Amino acid sequence: DYSWQIVDGGDVRAAGPFALAFSGGHHATIHRSIPIVDNVGVFVNETLYYPGDSFTVPPGAVEVLAVPASAPWLKIGEVMDYLDTVRPRRAFPTHERVNSDAGNAMANARITAVVEAHGGSVTVLQPGE
């Protein structure tokens, strides 16, 4: 059994040893015909930030960013702009399973180029990691 709570951008919660700060509020637009739903990003212990299905800029400096790499709501240029804004010290791609191997190689190269240009590093996780 797990308990759960609905959260909004600006909410702060604790879950065991984790301090969770939520930001944002809306899913990125997929298409004008598809209603926009709620979405929040989460900052874990002021270290790891995961924006969910959006490009919400986190409320502080980011040590580790779980960066969306592919999804029906994004294009790689937007990912690159987001990385230019957030400038994480470390990043790892998420949302990548919809890509082919060639698509992942292209996205990972673009993500790595931007993160490294700002002095950071990228780790590409494999399934199961």
Can you name each region flagged by the protein language model?
Residues 45, 68, 94:
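Conserved residues at the C-terminal ends of beta-strands
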Residues 27-28, 70-71, 97-102:
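Short histidine/acidic/glycine/proline-rich micro-motifs that form metal-
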Residues 76-96:
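Proline-aspartate-enriched helix->loop->beta-strand connector
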Residues 1, 62-66:
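Active-site metal-binding motif and surrounding structural segment of the metallo-beta-lactamase
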Residues 36-37, 76, 80-81, 105-111:
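Charged helix-capping and loop-helix junction motifs
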Residues 3-19, 90-129:
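Binuclear metal-ion centers of metallo-dependent hydrolases, dominated by the metallo-beta-lactamase
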Residues 4-60, 73, 126-129:
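Core dinuclear metal-dependent hydrolase active-site scaffold
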